[in-house]
Amino acid sequence: MQVSDGRGRSVADGGLGRWLAAVAPRSARGELGVAFVSDSRMRALNKKYRRKDYATDVLSFPGDILGDLVIATGVAKRQARDAGHSYQTELRVLALHGLLHLLGYDHEDPDDKGRMARMETRLRRKGGLKAGLIGRAVAPPAAASSESASRAAAIRK
């Protein structure tokens, strides 16, 4: 797993990569990139790829091997405070949720919401998380798609 600041500079992940590898389902094979970005950058990405003008918490961009996750650090810090757990725990919740989107799960599809919720519950329990993202009353993140090259360029802007 490669973790960056959204501008191509590597940053420490605080054990997020090891944790995610331990809880990920077997179908999650390949390379995963994670970018931590500001709320303003996330708002711009959300507007560009989903036509929603607000900073969401996590976006998932499927790629050739697995894909990329973009996590808004400000949103994550606020959600951690509101949920009563640590920032690191919130990053795990968001990374797990985003990974499920990369694997094809979609809670915005009524036919798939229950399937995604069940998988999220199973994996978060495996990873020692008490709460998942689907069960919370927050603005729902969703998968967004783009070509790998334009995606990487968009994240670094």
Question: Each PLM stretch: what is its role?
Answer:
Residues 1-92, 100-157:
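An acidic/histidine-cluster motif and surrounding catalytic segment
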